[in-house]
Amino acid sequence: MINQKTASLIAASCELGAITTTNDKSDRKSTFEYGNNLGMAFQIKDDLFDFLGSENETGKDSGGDVKKNMITLPLIFCLENSTRSEKKKLKTLVRSKKKSNSNLREINDLISELGGFDYSKNKLQEFSDKAVAAIDGYNDSETKNSLIKLVEFNVSRLK
């Protein structure tokens, strides 16, 4: 699901940049892979903000995705890696029509206990590393440095 959102947009944008500057298909592939992995990392970071950030900190409504019944990576991981009773509890909380702050805190606590946040943070780093590896073959340059800094910024960004 995340690949159909932000990742595909960023990947296509990066590949278009390469198309306008070179005929080398390997450059196009590298920039596409860079963009796809950066996009995946960006979306995961956004998913984490939804659970772990406050609106004042991130500019994003805390729990907004859950309130809209959107299933994001931390939830997917927990639903796939929990006991039947944990899964039932999580589904009940997420499907609740009215999601109070107390309800959202309980969802966050359960995701934390089940390892959903740690898993998502690890995947964020994994996709970030893949983005940098995709452009590893490029000569060192200001442009390459900028692309690497963009990946690093995404990992550490607070908004």
Q: Language-model features: where?
A:
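All-alpha prenyltransferase/terpene-synthase fold signal
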Residues: 1-159
